[in-house]
Structure formats: structure tokens, C-alpha cells
Regions:
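Glycine-rich Rossmann-fold phosphate-binding loop(s) that bind the pyrophosphate
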Residues: 11
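Beta-strand->loop->alpha-helix junctions that form or flank phosphate-binding loops
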Residues: 58-59, 96-101, 235-252, 298-302, ...
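Short beta-strand "acidic-cap" motif of Rossmann-like dinucleotide-binding folds
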Residues: 29-33, 141, 163, 240, ...
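Phosphate-binding loop of NTP-binding sites
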Residues: 4, 23-24, 62-69, 76-222, ...
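C-terminal helical cap/extension that packs against the catalytic core
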Residues: 45-46, 359-413, 449
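NAD(P)-binding Rossmann-fold cofactor-contacting core
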Residues: 27-45
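Glycine-rich, highly charged phosphate/nucleotide-binding loops
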Residues: 49-63
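Nucleotide phosphate-binding/pyrophosphate-handling subdomain across enzymes
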Residues: 2-5, 17-25, 138, 264-368
Length: 450
């Protein structure tokens, strides 16, 4: 990758990190983003300009990409039908992404553990990283978890381990990328707007295994039929987790087993929900493959409080427990969250109008006593609640809904922000919605809200 001419399409963290990496390789780099400079990260832009990296913002000029370029590096959030991608294909210019770039620059004997899936991948990635780190093995966390792999290249040494969360958008433009251990947590319909249909989405997810050989490991959820079907022809050695059958790691009588070896009792885990049992099983299986001591596994699983914004326990106020699941931007995630509690639930539901079918929650709401509809689709939330005879209040903004929650909540309730909706009607990112919810909980605890 030295001395190449490269067009980077899209700034963000991955484009910025790729640009810095390529600059060190004496590449001629041009970075282009449709957003104007005012809408982008000024610190990133200033650093790029100081390095004499050409930046073109505010448009995608028709004449920018030509056959003089060696590579087009595309931000994962940009679709493959973008005009530059189509033109690159016509000109025979390879289209890759930051993950692929980083992979080509890593020491050959680095061990790569990659996790993908429709749900649970961030929690699973974090659990695996925490276990390996506590064991004392040299490990780095990167990928779709906030740290581009390019950003850690200078820290990685031969023999190190990289634990990387890989999204479907990142998988869409890999070429040679090959993890030593690849984990597929599960498959369910998601990102249909990006990939066109569920079949396309599943095929992209399965690309995580495409370069693996028989000496590499694939970890599959045996209880998820789509995962089984989509990986039936891969060359990797397949290992399985299961809640219901005796597999490599399995769950029986409320206990975790690796083959016939008892690992721990589920009650020792802080995290709620069967989905977190599955996440823990993936982490246990990876840990056993790395010969990590059971005491380390148990210690991490006992003390892990979850990933921020993913069914995150926030606090308890007046014997009412608050959970922030703002990352539940689809129906499936909210189904999982609702299945995690037996106590009465006050549910915050709604956000960006995407035509999401709230009726798909009807089999999961037996413990929901009040629904507070928020955001753009709040009227449809009320229709759903009325249809299922659940008391409902609707508000445009979360802050007003939170005030109503204070009025109607009682000792022993669970207050759950699990919106089954994206947040872009009011927030730049769903994390902002979660942070606002947590702020209101803190204010309530400190006596500032009533």
C-alpha cells in the first residue's frame, strides 16, 4: 500500500484514521465528503490539512475519480451503488474499506477475533475483550466499537490479539480480511434499507467466514436457524453454542458448560436476559479456545455491568429500577429487552417514523403496565397500546414523558427505555437519547425532578 494514490469517500472516524495511515505510507490521499466542512469534525480536518492531505467537502464532483487512482476506500455507511463506487468498478479500481486496509498492514502472526451478528455483537465483543485482557494476554479492542483498526496499528505487535466488532456495512467491502476466530451471534432481519432485502443482508454477514480455512474457527449459534443455513458451506471448523442442546458450550439447569465441564452458575451473572446468556456462551467458548482459566471467565461475567446504552442498568430510585436500552432501534431488540424482566414495566417506545410494526411486540408485553410513546411515531405507539388495552401517554419529547413516568411509577416497577425506533427524528445519534434518559434518572435521584 506504499506510494499509492487513494480517494477516501467519507470522513468520519474510519476515513480520518485511514487517511492518517496512508499518509505515513507516502500515499497521495484525497478525502471527499458530501457534508460541508462546518458539519464535520474540525479537529480532524485541521490535522488532515496540516499534513497536506487534500480535502474536498460539500459535494461529490463528477470529475474527481479517474483511472489515476489505485484505490477507493469507502466509508461503511455509504452504499455500493454510490456513483464513485460504480465508476471505480468500471475503471477497475479496487473498492475497499478501512478494515481491509488495516488488515493488509497488520503483522502476519496477529490473532484476529471478529464478532458480527444482528444483535449482541457489541456486548459479546466487550466480554471477550475483557476476559482476554484480564487473563494477561496482549489484546487490543477495535472495529465497529468506536476504534478503527487503523488507529491501533502502531500499538499492535507480533503475536498480539485483536478483538474486533465488524458490522455488515464493513463486511460489504472486505477482500482478503480473515479472522482466526469468527463469531456470528445470530441473524434476524435488519438494515433492509441498506441491502435491499434480508437475503442480501445474510449473505453479507456470512462474508466474515469467506476467507477462513479449515485451520480457522467459526462460532455459530445453534439455536438460530438462519445462522446455521447461512454458514453450512463455509470451510472453517464450526463450533456451536446453544441454550437448548448439548453443544460445545451449552446452558443446562441454569448453568454454563463447556463440553462436560461446568463453568459457572448463571445466577452469578449480573446481566439479565437469555440474549446475554448467549453472549456469555460465545465469550466462554472463545476463552476456552485460548486456554483461559475459568476463574478469569467467572470474574468477568460476575462483574460485567453491560455495554452503555444496551439494556444498561442505570440506577434504582425509590425502589424503581431504570434501564437504558436506547440502542434498541428495531423491534427485535425491544422483544429481547421485554423478555428480560418479570416485574411490571413502564416502557418508553417510539422515535423516528420508519413504518416499524409495533404489533410484533404483542407477545412480549404481558408485564408492560404503561407505555409512554415518544417521538415522530408516537401516535402509532398509542394505537398499538390501545389495541392491547395498555395505558398509554404520548409526548413529542422524552423529558415530558419522563415527568409522566414519575407520576405513574410505583415501587417495584422497571422503567425501560427500549424504543424499537431510531432516534434521528430528534437526535444525531441514539446515544444522545440514552444520555438524556440517564441524566433525568440522575436528576430524579438527586431530588431535582418531580
Amino acid at each position: 500500500m506504499h506510494n499509492k494514490k487513494v480517494l477516501i469517500l467519507g470522513l468520519a472516524r474510519s476515513g480520518y484514521s485511514a487517511a492518517l495511515t496512508l499518509n505515513k505510507l507516502n500515499c497521495e490521499v484525497i478525502i471527499n465528503d458530501y457534508n460541508t466542512e462546518e458539519k464535520l469534525n474540525s479537529n480532524q480536518i485541521n490535522e488532515l490539512k496540516e499534513l497536506n492531505i487534500k480535502c474536498i467537502f460539500g459535494s461529490h464532483p463528477d470529475d474527481l475519480l479517474d483511472k489515476s487512482f489505485d484505490y477507493l476506500i469507502k466509508n461503511p455507511g455509504i452504499r455500493n451503488d454510490h456513483k464513485y463506487v460504480l465508476k471505480a468498478n468500471e475503471l477497475g479500481i479496487p473498492v475497499i474499506n478501512e478494515v481491509e486496509l488495516a488488515y493488509r498492514l497488520l503483522p502476519k502472526d496477529v490473532n484476529i477475533l471478529s464478532i458480527t451478528g444482528s444483535n449482541g455483537k457489541t456486548t459479546t465483543t466487550t466480554l471477550i475483550y475483557n476476559i482476554i485482557k484480564k487473563s494477561g494476554l496482549p489484546v487490543h479492542l477495535a472495529g465497529n466499537i468506536g476504534y478503527p483498526i487503523c488507529s491501533i496499528l502502531d500499538k499492535v505487535k507480533s503475536g498480539d490479539i485483536i478483538v474486533s466488532e465488524i458490522s455488515c456495512q464493513q463486511l460489504a467491502n472486505i477482500d482478503k480480511f480473515k479472522p482466526n476466530i469468527a463469531v456470528l451471534t445470530n441473524l434476524s432481519p435488519a438494515h433492509i434499507d441498506f441491502f435491499g432485502n434480508y437475503d442480501n443482508y445474510k449473505k453479507v454477514k456470512a462474508k466474515l467466514f469467506k476467507n477462513q480455512t479449515s485451520s480457522d474457527i467459526a462460532i455459530i449459534n445453534n439455536d438460530n436457524l438462519d445462522s446455521i443455513n447461512e454458514t453450512k458451506d463455509i470451510k472453517s471448523k464450526k463450533l456451536f453454542i446453544s441454550l437448548t442442546n448439548k453443544k460445545d458450550v451449552y446452558f443446562k439447569d441454569n448453568k454454563f458448560y463447556y463440553h462436560n465441564e461446568l463453568i459457572m452458575d448463571r445466577d452469578l451473572m449480573f446481566l439479565k436476559g437469555n440474549h446475554n446468556v448467549e453472549n456469555a456462551m460465545d465469550a466462554i467458548l472463545v476463552a476456552k479456545l485460548l486456554n483461559i482459566n475459568n476463574d478469569v471467565i467467572i470474574d468477568v461475567l460476575k462483574n460485567f455491568r453491560g455495554v452503555e446504552h444496551r439494556l444498561e442498568y442505570v440506577d434504582e430510585v425509590n425502589n424503581i429500577k431504570f434501564y437504558n436500552d436506547t440502542e434498541a432501534t428495531n423491534i427485535k431488540c425491544t422483544q429481547i429487552a421485554l423478555s428480560s424482566f418479570n416485574e411490571p414495566i413502564i416502557l418508553f417506545l417510539g422515535g423516528l417514523e420508519r413504518g416499524q410494526n409495533f404489533n410484533d411486540l404483542k407477545d412480549y408485553i404481558k408485564n408492560v403496565k404503561v407505555i409512554i410513546g415518544i417521538g415522530e411515531c408516537r401516535e402509532r405507539v398509542r394505537e398499538f397500546a390501545n389495541k392491547n388495552n395498555i395505558e398509554c401517554f404520548i409526548f413529542e419529547h422524552l423529558k415530558d414523558g419522563f415527568k409522566k413516568m414519575v407520576e405513574v411509577s410505583k415501587t417495584g416497577d422497571i422503567v425501560l427505555l427500549s424504543p424499537a425506533s431510531a432516534s434521528w427524528d430528534q437526535y444525531k445519534e441514539c446515544e444522545e437519547r440514552g444520555a438524556e434518559f440517564k441524566k433525568y434518572v440522575e436528576e430524579l435521584k438527586n431530588g431535582k425532578r418531580n
